[in-house]
A protein has these predicted regions:
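Active-site-proximal or metal-binding-adjacent scaffold patches in catalytic folds
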Residues: 1-187, 197-233
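Walker B catalytic acidic pair
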Residues: 193
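Walker B beta-strand of ABC/ABC-like P-loop ATPase nucleotide-binding domains
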Residues: 190
Length: 233
């Protein structure tokens, strides 16, 4: 399709979509549209959203990526919105413990620096996932009663660009990294997915369900847009 634009746009037509979706991905733009939509209609939609697309591309280009973790003693790690200092202890087996303002982690002393970093990262990720499943299940149980829904299952995923999902059969998956965020953000994500059991879309009716439980949900959505890239271990 010849769009006659200097914007880095790729158009994808699929039978799986009923509406138009525009995504900013790695400095480019993916426009995903229903297969039945004419090229002329697609061009018109892109033209109308040109200002929005340029704004999003500019914001992405100005975004500073978080500094990669080094997995060394004294480094800060966040859990449920609070920062903890990592304290590495030689002659350990990878068990992670929360002690006051510290996350202590024992590692085998014989490991090389590279192997130690990998060992520490894997141990921390395992700890975060274990706590994520526990906390997300607890929060889901709480909000299920309020919304009067019963998920078929609660599981964790390692999503790259989403915080959760809800299948038509009621299977809910959460991105385990959401447990890094403050409590109120985790609550929003849990309610967001549970409300999809009432409305499997993002219609005004769906958002009314969300707002009935999380009145300030728009602030939580904005928080995730601004801070989501920093939620990693």
């Amino acid at each position: 399709m010849n769009l006659k634009t200097d914007l880095p746009i790729e158009v994808f037509k699929t039978d799986r979509r009923k509406t138009v979706c525009i995504k900013i991905v790695d400095g480019g733009v993916h426009v995903i549209v229903p297969k039945r939509l004419s090229d002329a209609r697609v061009k018109d939609l892109i033209l109308k959203r040109t200002s929005w697309i340029k704004q999003k591309l500019r914001i992405q280009s100005e975004t500073v990526l978080p500094k990669p973790k080094e997995y060394v003693s004294g480094e800060s790690f966040t859990y449920l919105g609070k920062n903890y200092k990592l304290k590495l202890i030689p002659n350990g087996d990878g068990e992670v413990k929360m002690k006051g303002k510290y996350l202590t982690l024992g590692y085998p002393k014989i490991l090389s620096e590279t192997d130690r970093q990998s060992f520490v990262k894997e141990s921390l990720v395992g700890w975060y996932k274990g706590h994520a499943l526990k906390r997300l299940t607890e929060k889901s149980n709480r909000y299920e009663k309020i919304l009067r829904v019963t998920p078929r299952s609660i599981s964790l995923k390692n999503y790259k660009s989403r915080w959760g999902s809800c299948s038509n059969s009621g299977e809910i998956n959460f991105n385990w990294k959401i447990i890094i965020a403050p409590h109120h953000i985790v609550d929003y994500v849990v309610v967001h997915e549970l409300c999809h059991m009432l409305e499997h879309n993002h219609s005004p009716k769906y958002w009314r369900h969300v707002q009935s439980v999380i009145p300030d949900y728009k602030m939580d959505r904005q928080w995730l847009k601004v801070n989501g890239m920093g939620l990693f271990v």
